[in-house]
Amino acid sequence: MARAKICGLRTRETWLAATDAGADWVGFVFFPRSPRFVTIEALKAIGADARVPRVGLFVDPEPAAIEAVLKVQDLEFLQIYAGAEACRAMRARFGAKVWRAVGVASAADLPRDDEGLDGFLIESKPPRGADRPGGNATAFDWAVMQGWRAPAPWLLAGGLTPANVAAAVRASGAAAVDVSSGVESAPGEKSVPLIRDFVAAAHAA
């Protein structure tokens, strides 16, 4: 069984679909260039029910950006695209657990120590010319993770779908997986049936 995170939620309907499906985490994207960007107003409409741990995704964030979100919504985890030092600073400042996103093309890219953080999101490096660091529906060769001794808890992401998540778990050894574009009918538009299918497939893996 792999735990499942559904990221990029923007509406109460899809948040409810993820929680009702049994998702282990729900994620919200606070990066304006992403089609999954959620505004503070939309976050308020989703509500403050914290039955499932919430994760906020930020890219090279200024502290004020995180503070604005935390005034509206508690976040159990910050998923940050930045260097280790910046991630540690945000962890110390806000007292939240921090997962650092790490782009991987080969085994050499995998973290070798915990960097003073709570975990990692391991995904493919963005394609050349991409305007965002994640959510690009691109997978990497999961076989590069064979023999890796993870220094902290981690989630596998990048190009995952209901159809391939079981194979990804087997090949990588992941105990947790993260999906965004793989449960969408169009960029930024989550599909309730795909959310249900993904969580079920991950939990059955």
From Swiss-Prot:
InterPro entries: Aldolase_TIM, PRAI_dom, RibuloseP-bd_barrel, TrpF_fam. It holds the Pfam family PRAI. Keywords: Amino-acid biosynthesis, Aromatic amino acid biosynthesis, Isomerase, Tryptophan biosynthesis. It catalyses: N-(5-phospho-beta-D-ribosyl)anthranilate = 1-(2-carboxyphenylamino)-1-deoxy-D-ribulose 5-phosphate. Pathway: Amino-acid biosynthesis; L-tryptophan biosynthesis; L-tryptophan from chorismate: step 3/5. GO terms for biological process: L-tryptophan biosynthetic process. Its EC number is 5.3.1.24. GO terms for molecular function: phosphoribosylanthranilate isomerase activity. Belongs to the TrpF family. HAMAP family: PRAI. This is N-(5'-phosphoribosyl)anthranilate isomerase. It comes from Acidiphilium cryptum (strain JF-5). The lineage of its organism: Bacteria, Pseudomonadati, Pseudomonadota, Alphaproteobacteria, Acetobacterales. The gene is trpF.
